[in-house]
């Protein structure tokens, strides 16, 4: 710890002794809290400034928990290159924007047209995958469109570089990214025969067209072309099967609604639910002043979502399938962008 800070804190504790009992106890608690906060800040700064120790600890943990050779793990980590742009991008996520600014990023006429073309060019594959997993072809197309612009988004980062940078130089989410780094090192197999430094993806370490994190690759990636390996960069059957399996695994309900624009009564009850869990029957929402132009069972579970649109607040009634989309990205803005893009793709594909 900086010696000036240490001296100032000690002098402050001595000064506490000049106050009365009650005030002295209050100030003691306050200074103890501030000291703990300072120590924690210094510890985090030291961890980011000296990742070597953290890397060694990580290597020992991989050896202890997974049987990997610690020296081999360190050798792989040392192949990584620190990328400041990863940290910079992590600190300004698109999901921080309001809906009126977020939607135009993903739901564009170009992306709709490309999605409709992707749907038509791969209809047999998408219908086969959709039938296998119960997921609409246009939803698979929309996910691929949002995540990688149908493969046109450059995979600028080596996944190893991104994950090592975030695991050891980004304290706010170091625990999560170290777990993903661990998964990356455990992925290598006959079905996924790639060295960690060969894999390319996003600034967050998400891989291929569907932008799967290593843990998602391990759990949900599937082979779709019977060639004996999973390729999320070049094999459309593998890419589409993996997306379809992901949604099935999280409980996609075939044929069920996703979201409906709400009609709001003048005397509607103010309602701002936390999260996307559909906890209200449609009948309850209707009694509170929120209805949708659709014939659905009044007992259907749903919830209400408020978005900041171009013309003011937008209210949407969302269902279980909307929540399932959020398993891909927890932001409700993301789920709505995917849903609206999928609807637009389907409409464009049907157009003469």
Where do the language-model regions lie?
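Acidic/His-rich structured neighborhood in mature extracellular/periplasmic domains
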Residues: 104-242, 248
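Bacterial N-terminal signal peptides
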Residues: 28-40
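Acidic helix-start/capping segments at beta-turn-to-alpha-helix junctions
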Residues: 73-95, 144-148, 158-161, 261-269
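Flexible, glycine-rich surface segments
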Residues: 195-310
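Sec/Tat signal peptide C-region and signal peptidase I cleavage site
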Residues: 41-45
């Amino acid at each position: 710890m900086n010696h000036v800070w240490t001296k100032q804190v000690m002098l402050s504790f001595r000064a506490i002794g000049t106050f009365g009992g009650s005030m002295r106890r209050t100030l003691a608690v306050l200074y103890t809290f501030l000291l703990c906060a300072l120590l924690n800040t210094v510890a985090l700064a030291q961890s980011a400034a000296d990742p070597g120790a953290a890397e060694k600890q990580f290597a020992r943990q991989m050896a202890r928990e997974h049987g990997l050779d610690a020296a081999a793990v360190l050798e792989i980590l040392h192949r990584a290159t620190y990328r400041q742009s990863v940290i910079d991008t992590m600190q300004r996520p698109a999901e921080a924007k309001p809906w009126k600014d977020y939607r135009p990023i993903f739901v564009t006429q170009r992306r709709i047209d490309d999605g409709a073309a992707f749907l038509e060019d791969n209809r047999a594959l998408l219908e086969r995958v959709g039938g296998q997993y119960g997921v609409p072809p246009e939803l698979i197309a929309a996910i691929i469109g949002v995540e990688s612009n149908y493969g046109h988004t450059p995979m600028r980062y080596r996944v190893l570089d991104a994950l090592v940078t975030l695991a050891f130089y980004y304290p706010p989410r170091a625990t999560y990214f170290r777990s993903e780094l661990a998964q990356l090192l455990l992925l290598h197999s006959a079905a996924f025969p790639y060295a960690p430094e060969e894999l390319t993806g996003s600034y967050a370490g998400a891989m291929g067209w569907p932008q799967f994190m290593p843990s998602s690759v391990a759990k949900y990636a599937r082979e779709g072309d019977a060639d004996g390996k999973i390729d999320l960069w070049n094999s459309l059957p593998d890419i589409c099967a993996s997306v379809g399996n992901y949604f099935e695994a999280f409980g996609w309900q075939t044929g069920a609604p996703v979201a409906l624009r709400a009609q709001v009564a003048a005397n509607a009850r103010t309602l701002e639910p936390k999260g996307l869990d559909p906890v209200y029957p449609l009948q309850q929402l209707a009694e509170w002043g929120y209805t949708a132009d659709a014939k659905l069972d009044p007992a259907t579970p749903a919830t209400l979502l408020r978005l900041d649109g171009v013309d003011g607040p937008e209210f949407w009634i969302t269902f279980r399938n909307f929540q399932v989309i959020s398993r891909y990205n927890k932001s409700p803005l993301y789920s709505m962008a995917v849903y609206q893009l999928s609807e637009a793709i389907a409409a464009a594909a049907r157009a003469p």
